Amino acid sequence: MNYTIEKVTTLIGARRYGDKDANISFVLTDSRSLCFPEETLFFALKSERNDGQNYIPELYARGVRNFVVEVVPEGWATRYPDSNFLKVVGSLEALQRLAERHRDEYLIPIVGITGSNGKTMVKEWLYQLLSPQMVVTRSPRSYNSQIGVPLSVLLLTENTQVGVFEAGISQPGEMMALRDIIQPTIGVFTTLGTAHQENFPSIEAKCHEKIKLFHDTEAIVYSSDDEVMMQCLSQYDYKGQKLDWSVKNAEAAFYIKAIEK
């Protein structure tokens, strides 16, 4: 990514404190990962255990001059000269909004992968298959959370020809935000299992939440051997192409006759 600080301010709907010119090429949420301070925008995220604003003094001392915050530090103009503070209502929502606007710039195939297990494995398989012929941008490691997905999508560049991103959820209501950020054109539903089941009333409820990722995709790849997955898809208003794989049904789009280990 490459945006001026003015452009970022507009994209995330922030109020800007400071007038220092800056070009932003990197987004940071973890102070331990700082590499290029002058081109970095730090999002001070809050969690139950931590508050990103506590790291502003350290990051400023290390050269960072651009921050997204929910509360502007008292005396910022004298404590942090030559800096910009972008004030927002929610720092996580601002990060997600920036990624969503960044994704809007790319009219390319994007594969969105979800499921209880196997997301990272499938992503890496696709990368190995596609990268010899295409420039592929993919999620780093297992970046599939409410923070990891926007950080992944912000890696898209003008050279990217296809994106491959994971989307993981742990509770109801999370997938819509990830869908808006990834905006997949092709969907892959790996498996449906018990991971994070404690926050859902039933496995069917979790399935319905996960398939929201595929609402606007042109095609979805899934297992027709999974009865719950099949039931959820039949109840979902999905208008794209359904490409099922099976080890039982020879009529499936992809019939697996044998598996060699």
Residue map of PLM features:
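Adenine nucleotide phosphate-binding catalytic loops in nucleotide-utilizing enzymes
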Residues: I203-E204, K239-K261
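Phosphate-binding loop of NTP-binding sites
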Residues: E93-S224, M230-G240
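A short, gly/pro- and small-residue-rich
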Residues: G52-R65, F85-G90, Q183-T185, H208-K210, ...
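Residues at the C-termini of beta-strands that transition into short coil/loop
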Residues: K20, V89, P140, W245-K248, ...
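Short, polar loop motifs at secondary-structure junctions
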Residues: V68-W76, S224-V228, V247-K248
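Conserved beta-strand scaffold positions in the cores of enzyme catalytic domains, especially
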Residues: R16, F85-K87, I110, V136-R138, ...
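N-terminal leader/targeting and accessory segments in enzymes
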Residues: M1-R97
